[in-house]
Amino acid sequence: NLSFIQEYDVYTPGQDFLFTSKDNIFVAWKVGEPVTKMQYIRKSMFQYEKEWLNGLTWRSWVYNQNNQAAGTLKYIEKEADGTLIQKKDITTSEIGTQLRFAPGERSYDGRSGKESVFNLSKDAPIFKLSHQLGIKGVLGGEYNYNHTEVSAEKRIWLSSFGHIDTQLKAGKVWNKVPFPLLILPNTNQSITIQPEAFHMMNALEFVTDQYVSFNATYYLKGWILNRIPGIKWLRLREVISFNGIYGGLTDKNNPALTPNLFLLPDGTRPLGKTPYMEASVGLENIFKILRIDYYRRLTYLDEPNIKKGGVRIALRFSF
């Protein structure tokens, strides 16, 4: 499978919609802090994917990308003598590869690939290992960098008590790079529930160059509510989730300690010694299709311009 992608669009740093389009009408309904820090992205990408019957998939890519600061986002580089220089844009050239192993998986390979919601075998464990290599001096690339990611996910069945979908991820940026090339935890500022995203974290609130994250969603399948007279006939199903990330910013990528780096934007800080955590409780199968969750932020509660809690919704068919 060989593909070519040419893209010119505007994005919010720290907000990637992994399972839907960012132009989705529901995703466009924002409930978090107003998003004013943007980037114009111009990207050209070749990608090759090969799949084997044993569940192994190999994907490789090469791309050239230009990021231009927009809105209130500024690229301001601090020199060794304290001089501040504003840059209009940055360019990166990258080659990358990913191995994905999901033994026993059966999936519908649509626009979202094997991560589609139409995956027919959610019980299969999924393991991923990827590496991105930035090359300076090729097609205008300005930075050498190495970025490694590894993840594992599995559905755990608890018999009549429902099941838990779990995911463990870790990543590291090995080189000195400006903050747009560091790890920005994925946030969700929309009214919708988005997998693998933090719903109570502001976009660009934290930055890190190494992290470990854990996500778990427990589907109780009506184990509690089906035992309550008068409510059982509604066939509501309980959902509980937890999202957390722990990481840090090494000295070489901290502009407060190392020169020739971009200053962090206002409202952005390194992820500290305390992990960021949030949890939710909710109901699904409302009118057979609707899910409503209440999310609560558990740490970093004293930060300015944050929301400690909020309601998110999703359209989810349950069988």
Name each model feature, range by range.
Residues 1-319:
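Exposed, low-structure sequence patches enriched in small/polar residues
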